[in-house]
Amino acid sequence: MFESAALGRSYPAKEYAALENDLRMKLFKAQGTCIEHKLPVLITIAGVDGSGRGAVANMLSEWMDAKTIRNHVFWMQTDEERTRPEAWQFWNKLPAGGEIGVFLGGWYGGTIRRFCCGDIGEREFNASMERWRRLEHTLASSRTVIVKLWLHLGKKVQKARLKDRLKHQEIHHFTPYDKKSAENYDGLVSAAAKAITLTDRVDAPWTVIDAYDGNFRNASVARAIIAAVEAAVAVKRQNAVPVAPT
């Protein structure tokens, strides 16, 4: 599943400079379309540690109008969230019509890492995936545009980046699961592949992205969002009921 996303593809700076301007314009236009049609957009950014999940969130806020973007991080639960139903922390932060909700990790990140670390078994993992699949179907049925991104790195590249982060003491924000799963690359990737297989649907598809090069990663993310919005608008127009002449 991840072989083509671990090739280390990149865009030279000159080529990317021209491409970036075009993608910025299209992404900004897509955001305007969502505002016009009052479409909520839910973007989940998941992936291996060191793949640039935070950088992608920053890029989206820079390339689009940040006033309608809401970024949410789901690395650790608060005390209140632990007393609530599992989905409460997410329902409470879903985007309204015309807004873009960026979920770092989303409802997949924690479950994938707990399964990878052995904290939950396969039955519980599968049950969680089924709940998220149903939730996404419900959201998509109510016109939410769902974009799910898995940012990927090859094993050697990820190991080198993690080592560099440790060297520069950039590990302090990791939860225990983050650190443990980061050191178990094969287990994390296996769990992610299983999650993607179980939840990749037409109304809530996954896009697996080669995150080796920031330029290639950013361009791929922008294209995925633009394509999702265009598809949602096309479906809306297709389903529109024509007004009978008076």
Where are these regions (language model features)?
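P-loop NTPase motor core
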Residues: 79-137
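Glycine-rich phosphate-binding P-loop
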Residues: 43-60
